[in-house]
């Protein structure tokens, strides 16, 4: 099977949306019956994003096999219907770690280890390894051309054209074409300079995708084509849109997929984008608008909750409801400032780590429980829902998590068993942590649902598979008293009986789960828990109008 590689680089500034562009292009090519995969190369020194603050990097997307990866992999999965694995994302730190381990073992037979060829060879090997079962491999290179961190990756993809043949490689450069409002003009000079930098590395882009506030007119595209040495048909205008789900159609309308298929000499059927038409239609046509509050501590960067926000939108599509998402800093609720919660039709508390903002989250859960507002807790959102119920309903004021208070007298949430340094008193001391990364319960795990429960009804099956990312879990030895007071466990892991789902029966909609259902939601299908949560929030609005 002939393998064709499409390398996507970025220029001028970061955060132009290379991940969305790669996912959208992948969706179009997948619709042409091509076997697609997408790889993200990240130029930072961290081995993976698992220990990076969400405020700096955005959410950590967990794959089925338990890899902690860049949030762009979430876009890839949602757009191309393909499950990503640990092979689909690697970093400079991961590559150097791999090379240094080999050097320590003596695999290089005493050679002097250098960026070229050892690091670049390792990068190429990882790319090729991930491409085994695909005939089109899209590779997104993080960062911006000109950054020193990206140089080994750029050199590696330059060499790929030499290794496998230039005819099997396309270089796409995504660049900014700014619109200067005071002059009323689009400026192409930054793009020209970015391409010049790319040429200095030895890479001639084949296609330019021009990100701009407005559509780049033909005469400007001709100018870019002339100065950047690409055909005018290969200069694609990608203007700002109000929905990322419009981008596949936007690229298709400019025949980007035709250009690529002709370049690779692929005789494949035209892309049918009907499913994307349906998504766009669902997004525009709704019968109701509701307000959902996400109570968190990383709200300075909305990307920290990217998959949760997308899953809420997907659920809105399925219910013909527009979801207005409000990101609320949990610390603002700590002084019982319930005024900011009054207009919410649903409250969601997502995953997180550490004790900052926990009081505000506990108060938000209490407010939702007592005022019959639909509540959805995810990961940490389940753990603190249990703590809130234990403290305020059961009356166990000492109930807490050892993550927040290692000395607590009633550790209803505690460290996962059988982990290194399992004592929470020791683990919470930084000097006693051998490695923080890779010490969690990660990836897809089976869960058994209780008969006659809401979760069983929504999933319509007894055994479900969902993705996890947590270091703490419910202490089964202390939970019986809480369960007897009315907080039902309706889902447990098959392997070790871990509490996975809780429900409160005397409430319109109160459900929380230890896993992360947002990672498997798609714009076409949504996710059963999110869909019913939004449905319930819609009912709440009608009841309180």
UniProtKB/Swiss-Prot annotation:
Protein's organism: Buchnera aphidicola subsp. Acyrthosiphon pisum (strain 5A)
Domain of life: Bacteria
Chain sites annotated for binding Mg(2+): 72, 140
Subunit (UniProt): Homotetramer.
PANTHER family with a match to the protein in the record: CTP SYNTHASE (PTHR11550), CTP SYNTHASE-RELATED (PTHR11550:SF0)
One matching Pfam family: CTP_synth_N
Residues engaged in binding UTP: 14, 187-192, 223
Name of this protein: CTP synthase
Function: Catalyzes the ATP-dependent amination of UTP to CTP with either L-glutamine or ammonia as the source of nitrogen. Regulates intracellular CTP levels through interactions with the four ribonucleotide triphosphates.
Residues bound to L-glutamine: 352, 380-383, 403, 471
Pathway the protein takes part in: Pyrimidine metabolism; CTP biosynthesis via de novo pathway; CTP from UDP: step 2/2
UniProt-listed Gene3D superfamilies: 3.40.50.880, P-loop containing nucleotide triphosphate hydrolases
Regulation: Allosterically activated by GTP, when glutamine is the substrate; GTP has no effect on the reaction when ammonia is the substrate. The allosteric effector GTP functions by stabilizing the protein conformation that binds the tetrahedral intermediate(s) formed during glutamine hydrolysis. Inhibited by the product CTP, via allosteric rather than competitive inhibition.
Family according to the record: Belongs to the CTP synthase family.
Keywords: ATP-binding, Glutamine amidotransferase, Ligase, Magnesium, Metal-binding, Nucleotide-binding, Pyrimidine biosynthesis
InterPro entries in UniProt: Class_I_gatase-like, CTP_synthase, CTP_synthase_N, GATASE, GATase1_CTP_Synthase, P-loop_NTPase
TM region(s), chain numbering: none
Active site: 379 (nucleophile), 516, 518
């Amino acid at each position: 099977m002939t393998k064709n590689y499409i390398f996507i680089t970025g220029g001028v500034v970061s955060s132009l949306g290379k991940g969305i562009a790669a996912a959208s292009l992948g969706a179009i090519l997948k619709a042409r019956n091509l076997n697609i995969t997408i790889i993200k190369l990240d130029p930072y020194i961290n081995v993976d994003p698992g220990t990076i603050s969400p405020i700096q990097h955005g959410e950590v997307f967990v794959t089925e096999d338990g890899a902690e990866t860049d949030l762009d992999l979430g876009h890839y999965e949602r757009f191309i219907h393909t499950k990503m694995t640990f092979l689909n994302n690697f970093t400079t730190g991961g590559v150097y770690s791999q090379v240094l381990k080999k050097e320590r073992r003596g695999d290089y037979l005493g050679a002097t280890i250098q960026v070229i060829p050892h690091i670049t060879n390792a990068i190429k090997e990882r790319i090729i390894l991930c491409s085994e079962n695909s005939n089109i491999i899209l590779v997104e290179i993080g960062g911006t051309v000109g950054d020193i961190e990206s140089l080994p990756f750029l050199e590696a993809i330059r060499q790929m054209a030499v290794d496998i043949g230039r005819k099997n490689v396309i270089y796409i450069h995504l660049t900014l074409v700014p619109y200067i409002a005071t002059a009323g003009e689009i400026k192409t000079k930054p793009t020209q300079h970015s391409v010049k930098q790319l040429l200095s590395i030895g890479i001639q882009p084949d296609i330019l995708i021009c990100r701009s506030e407005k559509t780049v007119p033909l005469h400007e595209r001709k100018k870019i084509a002339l100065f950047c040495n690409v055909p005018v048909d290969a200069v694609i205008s990608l203007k700002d849109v109000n929905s990322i789900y419009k981008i596949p159609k936007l690229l298709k309308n400019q025949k980007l997929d035709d250009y690529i298929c002709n370049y690779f000499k692929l005789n494949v059927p035209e892309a049918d984008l009907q499913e994307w038409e349906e998504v766009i239609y669902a997004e525009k046509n709704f019968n109701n608008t509701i307000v959902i509050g996400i109570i968190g501590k990383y709200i300075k960067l909305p990307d920290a909750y990217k998959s949760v926000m997308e899953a809420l939108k997907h659920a809105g599509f399925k219910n013909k409801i527009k979801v207005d998402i409000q990101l609320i800093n949990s610390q603002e609720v700590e002084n019982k400032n319930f005024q900011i919660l009054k207009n919410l039709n649903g409250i969601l508390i997502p995953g997180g780590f550490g004790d900052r903002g926990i009081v505000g989250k506990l108060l938000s859960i209490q407010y939702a429980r007592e005022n019959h507002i639909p509540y959805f807790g995810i990961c940490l959102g389940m753990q603190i829902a249990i703590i809130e119920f234990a403290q305020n309903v059961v009356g166990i004021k000492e109930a807490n998590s050892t993550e927040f208070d290692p000395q607590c007298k009633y550790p209803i949430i505690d460290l996962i068993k059988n982990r290194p340094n399992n004592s929470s008193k020791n683990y919470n001391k930084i000097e006693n942590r051998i490695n923080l990364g890779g010490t969690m319960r990660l990836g897809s795990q089976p869960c058994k649902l209780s008969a006659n429960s809401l979760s069983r009804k929504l999933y319509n099956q007894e055994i479900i598979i969902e993705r996890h990312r947590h270091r703490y879990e419910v202490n089964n030895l202390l939970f019986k008293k809480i369960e007897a007071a009315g907080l039902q466990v309706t889902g447990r892991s098959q392997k070790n009986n871990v509490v996975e789902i809780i429900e409160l029966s005397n409430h319109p909609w109160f459900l929380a789960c230890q896993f992360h259902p947002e990672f498997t939601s798609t714009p076409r299908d949504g996710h059963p828990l999110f869909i019913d949560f939004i449905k319930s929030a819609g009912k709440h609005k009608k009841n309180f109008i």
